Swiss-Prot record:
Presence of keyword Heme: yes
Species of provenance: Lepidosiren paradoxus (South American lungfish)
GO function terms (MF aspect): haptoglobin binding; heme binding; metal ion binding; organic acid binding; oxygen binding; oxygen carrier activity; peroxidase activity
Job of this protein: Involved in oxygen transport from the lung to the various peripheral tissues.
The protein, known as: Hemoglobin subunit beta
């Protein structure tokens, strides 16, 4: 994947403009609420029976922060995101058996949360496309062990 300097710079800069803990937690909450079948991967998290239960679940919040931290770490590896995520790809395919489509769902929810946090003047359609590309590369990289 070829990355333009403007794409990389904007993607990196976004994470200094948002509350990473809040956006990470909200992203995973959104995934679990809007795409309820994803809850099957989080049986050990306790009560996920309603949107309120999900939003008040500390394990969901903590895991959302962890997931976003892993996404942010990918900004240090633009030249080799696939290689960087190889171990996570193996874990998700071989041990956790996560449907690879859910990685795309996560990317969609993250872009929604970023748009809400940054506003339309900052998170323009062009910049949204940068993040779609970034999350598509991450999704593909995480799903590569499935092929």
């Amino acid at each position: 994947v070829h990355w333009e300097d403007a794409e990389k710079q904007y993607i990196v800069s976004v994470f200094s403009k948002i509350d990473v803990d809040h956006v990470g937690a909200n992203t995973l909450e959104r995934v679990l609420i809007v795409f309820p079948w994803t809850k099957r991967y989080f049986n050990s998290f306790g009560d996920l029976s309603s949107p309120g239960a999900i939003k008040h679940n500390n394990k969901v919040s903590a895991h959302g922060r962890k997931v976003l931290a892993a996404i942010i770490e990918c900004t240090r590896h633009f030249g080799n995101i696939k290689g960087h995520l190889a171990n996570l790809s193996h874990l998700h395919s071989e041990k956790l058996h996560v449907d690879p489509h859910n990685f795309r769902v996560l990317g969609q929810c993250l872009r929604i949360e970023l748009a809400a946090a940054l506003g339309f003047k900052e998170f323009t359609p062009e910049r949204n496309a940068y993040f779609q590309k970034f999350m598509d590369v991450i999704s593909h990289s995480l799903g590569r062990e499935y092929h």
